[in-house]
Curated annotation (Swiss-Prot), chain A:
Keywords: Nucleus, Ribonucleoprotein, Ribosome biogenesis, rRNA processing. Component of the ribosomal small subunit (SSU) processome composed of at least 40 protein subunits and snoRNA U3. Its main location: nucleus. One of its GO terms (biological process) is maturation of SSU-rRNA from tricistronic rRNA transcript (SSU-rRNA, 5.8S rRNA, LSU-rRNA). It comes from the Eukaryota. This is U3 small nucleolar RNA-associated protein 25. Residues 1-12 have a biased composition (Basic residues). The lineage of its organism: Eukaryota, Fungi, Dikarya, Ascomycota, Saccharomycotina. The gene is UTP25. One of its GO terms (cellular component) is nucleolus. DEAD-box RNA helicase-like protein required for pre-18S rRNA processing, specifically at sites A0, A1, and A2. Belongs to the UTP25 family. Residues 1-22, 34-93 are annotated as: Disordered.
From Swiss-Prot, chain B:
Belongs to the DEAD box helicase family. DDX47/RRP3 subfamily. Its main location: nucleus. GO terms for biological process: rRNA processing. It is found in: Nucleus. This is ATP-dependent rRNA helicase RRP3. The keyword Acyltransferase does not apply. The gene is RRP3. ATP binds at A108, Q109, T110, G111, S112, G113, K114, T115. Residues 1-17, 33-46 have a biased composition (Basic and acidic residues). The Q motif is unique to and characteristic of the DEAD box family of RNA helicases and controls ATP binding and hydrolysis. GO terms for cellular component: nucleus. Its EC number is 3.6.4.13. GO terms for molecular function: ATP binding; ATP hydrolysis activity; RNA binding; RNA helicase activity. A motif (Q motif) lies at residues 64-92. It comes from Yarrowia lipolytica (strain CLIB 122 / E 150).
Length: 641, 480
């Protein structure tokens, strides 16, 4: 595995800056020694970081003839400019990023968000589409016009258009529903449990990213050429505001190396590049053959295929004809990273070495397979997003005369497009998505659910009990209380509770229940994502054989392993799983016992607690239709067969 | 004493140059010169000048209005709003020449209205020909830079003026951003401006039309010379340059020759010791009772705003703690404070929420504090120039003021030197020593507590930090 030569480049720059600092000190007739000391102090820190093994982090740029590349880009840009002028194209980029200052400022300041939603169908899948808009945002970019405009009328670089066509064919129904929001730089949240829909969505996103990166890079190169010519002729009054503080414009957060690799294939395909630099090295580090057991569910196979390393950061430079992996961050166009890998670079408050300047000018942030990242650690995602679009600490060679004015005014986050692709929307995703401030507005597409009640193929009693929680913060204690009172005590009193599987979402809830049951002398087994494999094996066996009557089982363990737990006679759900597939699988544990003959069908039962704060998860389990009647406050029980 | 000296306008054509017939640092001489010119003596100092020269006495009544000087209406209105009713002498003399497009050398002290004297012509020119990156003002200290930018902003508010302050000790990136927003006026300390010229890509002063050097003598004192040279090299030769200085040293003259073209020299002879409104006293006391005497003076003048000058930072810190322990609203101002803390301290004092400022010489010059009733010299400054500047904090703009110097047995020599420079003996401050000694016990206790507090917060770590910072404030203090 390639060791990362952490920030060799910045080191050089630091010496540079301290050099000029020295010079200044000399000018002031001051002692220079101190400045030297500063540099010395910093070096050990870097060595420390060199040992850190974040795959792909801060690679040093190999010898590249930047100027020649820029020239090529400028040539391409000139050609394209000719192409573009031929037809009347629809170009949302211009409307969004080159909006008139007075207008966007007034739109941003209004802060009046309006929401409307509609039910429609994408293909055969009924969906709900929610639009959230700022008042008057239409004056900048009329979204209805974006929707009316055909895909072929949008400005797309010819090479990308061809590449995308080859990769994708003509637009699918999913893509048709999405392209106006995506290409009009609206925030977009797309939830679907269908793998093929996800794939189609990703392809379109890859095309959009490629288009954004290539067009902006070419514009910069083209303008540089003009400036150079002007300088030769002694003209100084032309200026271009065409870039951010730092080069990277796109941030792609992916959970695993394999996901990164797969998305990269789409990007390469969609951008239609001829040349891939460092390809062998990238493939070696990110690609790994080998499938997951095919007995596991489909979405699990997809999520854990190939290289599941979740510690990497990768700078990618994308140009009209070539793509380069392992580009130095401050020269890259796209930063691919796992939340953990990027968080390690970004660091947290008080760390001696933090590096997040390269996130200052992100214009598109794409969260890929978001639910998986949620299971990894959502905090990392929040940290990383929190450090985007800030003023960098150092200039990193930025040409300030070309920085776009909305960066200078600190409004960059109002321009950033955030794209979230997920299987299902959870409260955490919702909170991130509703806190983005892109003035173009947002589009959220969620499926309408039929529910998972009938999927067991067998009549199973399913009881949903609503408890009362006054607020989100109160919910945790109220749930525990309700669980103990309604479920646990009655269960223990009845005496017959062998084969009870208690599903808790995370380790935190597991610990609380474990402590309580220890206190009450109730014997049980508990397995979580922190248990060793032997421990898990032992408890599963004991539970299957009926020697342990209760098994506590966490949702995160299920996410990472998808065990098939045997010997289940009753399922108790402490908190509904966000992933409806988990509920389906919990029911399958019961049907399996029935099939095996260890459980009478009439005795099989699944009990769940819920509150009004669980409606998103509940909707996916009982279906969109039923959830409405269940969405009330107060206590009540619902039984389904 | 305030007899209006007649205005002497002398126009001498550019004839010979290279006249370095000037004594370098005869400060006392300088002061004596100025006092002499008050007394209507013959033409002092600089025998050979290769420029138009105008001299005027500060106390002279101005009969002209801004409009008479040729200032355009919109700026006149702003002046009225800001209560600048009449031009001060330096403004009256320099603005007409400046509006003609001449370069200006101004010899004047802070408080004489010189900031507006250069701001108004710059703004007027900018008004007629709006363009970003129009003017650079160089100032020796951060505080002064902020004050200048405030004046510019106030005067230019009607025309939507944008200014940027670029000084050391603040975030380079924020400043780079401010510069790339293309301000009309940049107020800067030379070192940091050079830093930006060298390191901030995309920033240049190619279009500059005005250069103002404020307190040029201090700029040069603080070894900003090389930075100034660098700046002069990269800005266009086609420009107007204003140079303001308190004294005309040979260094300043060299700078003037290097940067100004056919300048008009406007000298305002400030009277340092106007007997009518500044009462200067001294208190002779034993060293060990210095604190007691100080507290007595403070308590006697309680309610008045005052500045106490001390020589060292730890003294300022100690005295402010001491006074606070005794219930007075005291606030220290010295170089160990961060930039924001300094501005904060100054603002608290300005707004009147604290009325005792204890300062090192950082604050002795360049700060425009509107009304101080009393200046106490806890230590006698080592040179008479500093003394003049310290007591110059009070009795400004025609108001009455008092200054008291605490002289201990160790300060005697310094004090005598100052008396010599002033050319007069100071009265002793009327106090009853018995009444003073009543304070001694409480003061001793408060002093002990103060020292204790200082030790408490002064760990070894902090010490090392202080050492680091020292270097930077030395440029503010401008010690010789």
């Amino acid at each position: 595995m390639a060791r990362s030569h952490k920030v060799t480049k910045p080191k050089r720059q630091q010496v540079d800056t301290s050099g000029s600092y020295n010079a200044l000190m000399v000018l002031m007739g001051d002692n220079v020694k101190k400045a030297e000391k500063r540099v010395e102090e910093e070096e050990p820190v870097e060595q420390e970081l060199e040992e850190d093994d974040i795959e792909g982090a801060g690679e040093e740029e190999e010898e590249v003839d930047e100027e020649q590349e820029e020239e090529e880009d400028a040539d391409d840009a000139e050609e394209d400019a000719e192409d573009d002028s031929e037809t009347d194209k629809y170009d949302p980029y211009k409307l969004h990023f080159e909006a008139e200052e007075a207008k966007y400022v007034s739109v941003i300041k209004s802060e009046e968000w309006k929401t409307s939603s509609e039910k429609t169908k994408i293909g055969s899948q009924p969906v709900r589409i929610t639009y959230t808009n700022l008042e008057d945002a239409d004056e900048l970019l009329d979204f209805s016009e974006a929707q009316k405009t055909e895909f072929s009328k949008y400005t797309v670089r010819p090479r990308i258009k061809d590449g995308f066509k080859q990769l994708n064919g003509s637009l699918t129904s999913v893509q048709k529903a999405i392209y106006p929001s995506l290409m009009a730089y609206r925030d977009l949240c797309y939830a679907t449990s269908s793998l093929s829909d996800t794939e189609e969505f990703s392809r379109l996103v890859a095309m959009h990213i490629a288009q954004h990166v290539v067009r902006t890079a070419e514009e910069v190169a083209y303008n540089t050429r003009i400036l150079k010519r002007n300088a030769e002729e002694g003209i100084h009054d032309v200026e271009f505001r065409d870039q951010g503080y730092t080069k990277p414009r796109v941030l792609v957060l992916v959970p695993t190396k394999n996901a990164c690799f797969e998305f990269m294939q789409l990007l390469v395909g969609a951008s239609g590049v001829d040349r891939e630099d460092n390809k062998a090295r990238f493939n070696k580090a990110f690609h790994e053959a080998g499938a997951v057991l095919d007995t596991k569910p489909e979405d699990f196979q997809k999520a854990f295929k190939g290289n599941t390393d979740d510690m990497f950061c990768l700078g990618v430079k994308l140009r009209n004809k070539s793509i380069r992996y392992y580009s130095y961050f401050y020269q890259a166009d796209i930063v691919f990273a796992s939340p953990l890998g990027l968080k390690t670079l970004v660091g947290s408050e008080g760390d001696s070495k933090r590096e997040f300047d390269f996130l200052s000018s992100i214009e598109i942030a794409y969260l890929h397979e978001t639910n998986h990242m949620e299971m990894q650690s959502w905090d990392n995602v929040l940290t990383v997003l929190g450090q985007t679009n800030l003023l960098p600490n150092e200039s990193h060679g930025c040409d300030f005369s070309r920085v776009k004015s909305f960066y200078l005014d600190g409004l960059a986050k109002h321009f950033r497009q955030t794209i979230v692709a997920c299987q299902f929307v959870t409260p955490t995703i919702n909170s991130v998505f509703s806190n983005t401030v892109n003035f173009a507005g947002k589009t959220k597409i969620t499926p309408i659910y039929n529910g998972e009640l009938a999927v067991a193929g067998m009549k199973i009693r399913q009881i949903f009990t609503r408890f009362k929680a006054l607020s989100v913060s109160d919910e945790i204690d109220a749930r525990f209380k309700a669980f103990v009172q309604i479920t646990l005590e009655g269960m223990i009193r009845s005496g017959d509770y062998s084969g009870t599987l208690i599903y808790v979402p995370t380790y935190v809830e597991l610990v609380r229940l474990r402590n309580y049951m220890d206190e009450k002398n109730i014997s049980f087994g508990a397995i979580s994502e922190y248990s060793s494999i032997t421990e898990v094996k032992r408890h599963r066996t004991l539970f299957r054989d009926g020697r342990e009557k209760i098994l506590l089982y966490t949702g995160r363990l299920h996410h990472y392993r998808r065990y098939f737990v045997k010997g289940v006679k009753s399922v108790v759900i402490y908190k509904l799983p966000e992933n409806p597939a988990f509920y389906r699988e919990l029911l399958l544990f019961l049907t399996h016992s029935v099939d095996e003959g260890t459980l009478e069908q009439s005795m099989a039962k699944c009990r769940a607690l819920f509150t009004i704060y669980d409606l998103l998860a509940l909707e996916r389990i009982v279906g969109t239709k039923r959830v409405k009647t269940m969405a009330k406050s107060g206590e009540s029980s619902y039984e389904f067969y | 004493m305030a007899k209006a000296t007649e205005k002497r306008v002398k126009r001498a054509k550019k004839e010979e140059s290279g006249s370095e017939s000037e004594d370098n640092d005869a400060i006392a001489q300088e002061i004596l010169d100025t006092t002499k010119s008050d007394n209507e003596e013959e033409e002092p100092k600089k025998s050979s000048k290769n420029y138009t020269s105008v001299e005027v006495d500060e106390s002279e009544e101005q009969t002209k209005t801004f409009k008479d000087l040729g200032v355009i209406d919109s700026i006149c209105e702003t002046c009225e709003e800001l209560k600048f009713t009449k031009p001060t002498p330096i403004q009256a003399q320099s603005i007409p020449y400046a509006l003609e497009g001449r370069d200006i050398i101004g010899l004047a002290q802070t408080g004489s209205g010189k900031t507006a004297a250069f701001a108004i012509p710059v703004l007027q020119s900018l008004y007629e020909n709006p363009q970003p990156l129009y003017c650079v003002v160089l100032a020796p200290t951060r505080e002064l830079a902020y004050q200048i930018s405030e004046t510019f902003e106030a005067l230019g508010s009607a025309m939507g003026l944008r200014t940027a302050v670029v000084v050391g000790g603040m975030n380079m990136m924020t400043q780079a951003v401010a510069l790339s927003k293309k301000p009309h006026v940049i107020v800067a300390t030379p070192g940091r401006l050079v830093d930006h010229l060298e390191n901030t890509k995309g920033f240049s002063l190619r279009t500059l039309k005005f250069l103002v050097m404020d307190e040029a003598d201090r700029l040069l004192d603080m070894e900003f010379g090389p930075s100034l040279d660098k700046i002069l090299k990269v800005i266009p030769r086609q420009r107007n340059t204003y140079l303001f200085s308190a004294t005309m040293t040979s260094k300043v003259e060299k700078l003037q020759r290097a940067s100004l073209v056919d300048p008009v020299r406007v000298a305002v002879s400030t009277k340092y010791q106007t007997a009518d409104n500044l009462l200067q006293y001294m208190v002779f006391c034993p060293f060990k009772h210095k604190d007691t005497h100080l507290v007595y003076l403070v308590s006697e003048n309680a309610g008045n705003s005052m500045i106490i000058f001390a020589r060292t930072k730890s003294d300022t810190q100690r005295i402010s703690l001491l006074l606070r322990n005794l219930g007075y609203g005291a606030i220290p101002l010295h170089g160990d404070l961060s930039q924001t803390a300094r501005l904060g301290a100054l603002n608290k004092f300005k707004s009147g929420s604290r009325n005792i400022l204890i300062a090192t010489d950082v604050a002795s010059r360049g700060l425009d504090i509107p009304a101080v009733d009393l200046v106490i010299n806890y230590d006698i400054p080592s040179d008479s120039k500093s003394y003049i500047h310290r007591v110059g904090r009070t009795a400004r703009a025609g108001r009455a003021g008092k200054s008291v110097a605490l002289v201990s047995q160790y300060d005697l020599e310094l004090y005598l030197r100052i008396e010599g420079a002033l050319g007069k003996k100071l009265d002793s401050y009327p106090l009853e020593s018995e009444a003073v000694m009543l304070f001694s016990e409480r003061v001793a206790e408060a002093s002990r507590a103060a020292i204790q507090e200082m030790k408490g917060e002064d760990g070894t770590k902090k010490r090392s930090k202080f050492d680091k910072k020292r270097r930077r404030d030395e440029m503010d203090i401008g010690e010789q």
